[in-house]
Amino acid sequence: MAKKLEQLQTAVQERLGERLRDCVLDADRGELAIEVAPADLHQAMTTLRDAEGLRFDMLMDLAGVDYAAWGEDEWFTDTAEGTGFSRGVQGNNFARLGITGIYGVQEITENTGRRFAAVYQLLSVELNQRLRVRCFCEDDRFPVLDSVVDVWSGANWFEREAFDLYGIIFDGHPDLRRILTDYGFVGHPFRKDFPLIGNVEVRYDEQKRRVIYQPVSIEPRVLVPRVVREDNRYADRKRREEGASDA
């Protein structure tokens, strides 16, 4: 398996060349993951599909990702803070009002170009090999990527889902519209700055005899307290290391 992955890695590097931003081989998991720039996405995907030794003829999945606050620790335990469960019982806070911010608190103002990404899972049926491709949107405020529907027709609904949930625009998509939420939905619910309780709620009005939108009436309350336990997964190894150092 490791040798086959190394051969695939070499083939990908040779075929994509400078279009390859990153290439990570995880032999333990049997995975190869690459990253390409948005300007090179469509051409790189076409190469991955058509090139000899690659032949990724199937797009198995496409998922949007919001990396806002990725790698930051939200499990503060010494003080009460706005990113924990406490915000669910405080009235008139950012999460309640729907003001943009990480977990409903800090406002997002910096454009990092590393917030929104699309991740593609590719399969070569002919060569029985897999590849993960990631591509970041350059603009956090208006994330755009090229559509790959003309490369793999199965990308159609995948891209619509990523647009619906994350607001990623796929340029060149033949019918880019919502697929999971209704057409009047406000915002993109999988973004990390989307209010936990939403912006509006929908109900059937008996008098008007139709479905109506109204302000959220939910009173959010967390009934299960946050419990932070000590991490004992490596306790035995830690004790052995401490014993060795004492000796």
UniProtKB/Swiss-Prot annotation:
EC number of the protein: 7.1.1.-
Regions that span the bilayer: none
Catalytic activity from the UniProt record: a quinone + NADH + 5 H(+)(in) = a quinol + NAD(+) + 4 H(+)(out)
Enzymatic class: translocase
Bilayer topology: Peripheral membrane protein
Cross-referenced InterPro entries: NADH_DH_suC, NADH_quin_OxRdtase_su_C/D-like, NADH_UbQ_OxRdtase_30kDa_su, NADH_UbQ_OxRdtase_CS
Protein's UniProt keywords contain Signal: no
GO cellular component: plasma membrane
Molecular-function annotations in GO: NADH dehydrogenase (ubiquinone) activity; NADH:ubiquinone reductase (non-electrogenic) activity; quinone binding
Cell location: Cell inner membrane
Annotated keywords: Cell inner membrane, Cell membrane, Membrane, NAD, Quinone, Translocase, Transport, Ubiquinone
Quaternary structure and interacting proteins, as annotated: NDH-1 is composed of 14 different subunits. Subunits NuoB, C, D, E, F, and G constitute the peripheral sector of the complex.
HAMAP family linked to this entry: NDH1_NuoC (MF_01357)
Known role: NDH-1 shuttles electrons from NADH, via FMN and iron-sulfur (Fe-S) centers, to quinones in the respiratory chain. The immediate electron acceptor for the enzyme in this species is believed to be ubiquinone. Couples the redox reaction to proton translocation (for every two electrons transferred, four hydrogen ions are translocated across the cytoplasmic membrane), and thus conserves the redox energy in a proton gradient.
The family this protein is said to belong to: Belongs to the complex I 30 kDa subunit family.
Protein name listed in UniProt: NADH-quinone oxidoreductase subunit C
Protein's organism: Alkalilimnicola ehrlichii (strain ATCC BAA-1101 / DSM 17681 / MLHE-1)
Gene behind the chain: nuoC
